[in-house]
Design a protein with these regions (language model features):
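Alpha/beta-hydrolase fold active-site loops
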Residues: 78-79, 109, 156
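A short beta-strand-turn-helix
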Residues: 55-79
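N-terminal targeting signals for export/organelle localization
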Residues: 1-61, 190
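Conserved hydrophobic packing residues within short motifs/helices of P-loop NTPase cores
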Residues: 81, 112-114, 159
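Structural microenvironment flanking redox-active thiols in thiol-disulfide oxidoreductases
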Residues: 92-130, 140-147
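Thiol/disulfide oxidoreductase modules built on the thioredoxin-like
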Residues: 126-133, 139-189
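C-type cytochrome heme c attachment motif
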Residues: 86-93, 156-157
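Short pre-active-site segment immediately N-terminal to redox-active cysteine/selenocysteine motifs
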Residues: 77-79, 84-87
Length: 190
């Protein structure tokens, strides 16, 4: 059994790195949101969702504790968490889809992000181009990402928490299209 583990681990690592692709895979998608749209107050929403929007497009260096505290504060609301890095081309490809879905579900699903394996400056520069209507938790050592299960080095990854705050599913790799992402939101973010 142990003899199989090392080759399988190596094979999985190769596939995980390949998932990040090249610039030809995703091009350079346009943002669906301006900075003003992404950071506009979320009026009429629950206090928890309004608080998430107050931190929109910010990189929060609060560690695992800050992230877990936010998840606990959102109990009663399903949460979608996308793990990304500025150098990951498939992450860039998914950003417009995540922008759309976050706005579409802004009153019933919380969205958060985890930026890992990257510098804080690189994450902030990336967000100037593709702003998010929710915060990114800085995770340089992938400690937050470890809680998603699976390989910490897999980018992108999208984790789904149900309204009780339990992690119910993590999708590793890029979504095929926005419809596949939307289907997982409907299936798991309850």
């Amino acid at each position: 059994m142990r003899r199989l583990l090392a080759p399988l681990t190596l094979l999985f690592a190769v596939f995980a790195l390949a998932a990040c692709g090249s610039d030809d895979d995703a091009g350079n998608p346009e943002s669906n949101l301006t900075l003003e749209e992404a950071t506009a107050p979320l009026e009429g929403a629950s206090p928890q969702l309004a608080a998430v929007r107050e931190d929109a497009n910010q990189v929060l260096d609060e560690g695992v504790e800050g992230y877990e505290e936010r998840i606990a504060e959102l109990k009663g609301t399903p949460v979608v968490v996308n793990k990304w890095a500025s150098w990951c081309v498939p992450c860039r490809r998914e950003f417009p889809w995540l922008q759309n879905e976050a706005i579409e579900h802004e009153r019933d699903v919380a969205f958060l992000a985890v930026g890992g394996n990257d510098s804080e400056d690189a994450l902030e520069t990336f967000l100037e181009e593709l702003p998010l209507p929710y915060p990114t938790y800085y995770d340089p050592d992938l400690e937050i990402a470890e809680g998603f299960g699976g390989p910490r080095q897999a980018f992108p990854a999208t984790a789904f928490y149900d309204s009780s705050g339990e992690l119910v599913y993590t999708h590793f790799g890029v979504y095929e299209d926005e419809e596949a992402l939307a289907a997982d939101i409907e299936r798991y973010a309850r």
